[in-house]
Each structure stands twice: as C-alpha cells, then as structure tokens.
C-alpha cells in the first residue's frame, strides 16, 4: 500500500496560485479506495480525485491554492480493506531503518517560500 506525489517534484519551482498535486497510488493485494493529500505536514487530510478506480493502481490529482508560504505536502492512500498507508515513523518502528525494499511510508515534500521543492523526512 503506497502513494507518491510525482508532481510537483524535485527541481520544480512553483509560483503562487493554483498548483496541481498529482501522483500514483497502488496496493499489492486489493483496490485503492481513496487517496488523501495533506498540505500542512499531515495535520489534516483532504480527498484527492482518483482515476482508474476499478484496479489496484490509480492516478490522483488535487488542486492546491498555494499562497507562497513554506509548507509540507504529502499523500496517503486507503485500500478497500480500510488499511491506511503508514507514516515513515510507523514503518521504521515496525521494520527498522534499513527497510528500503518494502518501504511504503508516507513521502514528504517541502515547498519553500521561494517555490523550490525539497524532499524531506518527517
């Protein structure tokens, strides 16, 4: 069970206004029920639009009105069994820090005040 934001990504430089957050989510054993986006480092979550709902992998989109402030964006997915993609901390607690092969924790991207994108760990 994993989702990842593919846009915006490292190397992009955003301008204030509407930003398309898009990505990909998948499950190895069942269908994806929904994808959620956080624009405040995981404090709150909003439902993203998903496409190809009938299969175990989906594309997702979310429109975010970025006001030029530094923020952290994340995605997480939920499958038909109501399992929620774990946080990085939950994966490390369960599997240790060297669990790179099956690492399915939530990935975080910082949008800096100047619009640059940076991959971070939280």
Can you name each region flagged by the protein language model?
Residues 2-122:
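Long, low-complexity serine/threonine/glycine- and acidic-rich segments characteristic of extracellular
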